[in-house]
Amino acid sequence: MLKQGKMDFFVTFNNVNLTYFTGFSGATALLIPKQGEGTLYVSAVNYEQAKTETKGLAVDLLKRGENLMQKIAAKTAPNKLAVDSLSIESWRSLAKAVGGEEKLETAGNLILELRSVKDQDEVKLIREACNLAEIGMQMAFETVKPGVTERRVAAEVEYAMRKKGADGTSFDTIIASGISSAFPHGSCTNRTIHQGDLVVVDLGATYQSYRSDMTRTFTAGKSTEKQMKIYETVKVAQQKAFKAISPNISAAQVDGAARRAIEAAGFGEFFVHNLGHGVGLEIHEAPILSPDSKDTLAAGNVVTDEPGIYLPGYGGVRIEDTVLITSNGAERLTTGYYSLETLR
């Protein structure tokens, strides 16, 4: 970005981007020059840890009372800076320090685009996060039954993942049962699961800052014919989308493959969200798989494939996998538990 543009430095204050570039999450800012060594700015509480955990960077201690913007200006003057993720107030403060807004330029979506293509090390971490998610889903499969509360299921799921090495969850675990399963982002409550309920389980694990995302739908007991029809429709839609995923295809085309399958079964109006999104250091990243997405998929993208049908007052079904886009197609990083019933 620096070599191709008119900027001489890039500076980021964004916690996620700081982790992406340095592997260290406790920094305040990172300054990268067009040539030479970058500088990581940290407070005293993180100084020794930063020196130990970061390589190839100068670590600059921010002493109490020092002005970060002025320190950056002193190192970059009289050059121009590309800036990422800054509040209006901080932008103005930095502009004042460097001598005017004409010295600054937003980095726009360049960093998001860079992060959307994962390297081998990132894929390895995401793969492990997905393995941990599968452990959580196994526990959900074993725990979902009449008489158990949603929060009990969530607690068992999260403990199972942490016990096997997860740093935490990718997001608040969703266990949505009964009519609440018709809420795409339903919360986890103390509701008791009843016989015959549809139960949507949406979970993910974090491993060394990288995330996974996986959803399955179960019934607590024997499924009805209507539940099975909805489930099989979603399952077919997910498979259609998965088969469509490949490098250089538009994200909108992949969304369309799933959406057409659901529409053909008569449930089109009940598929109310996008098909998927990128996954990495954040649970929602580029690219976006939606009907109006302008994104084109690329090898190294990690995305979700998560069609769903949600009938208000009745219940819903969603099936979701985390998917790696390869040079010639796609690979599911989460697998298993594609059966609706939890009790045989």
Region roles according to the model:
Residues 1-344:
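Active-site neighborhoods and metal-handling regions in enzymes and metal-associated proteins
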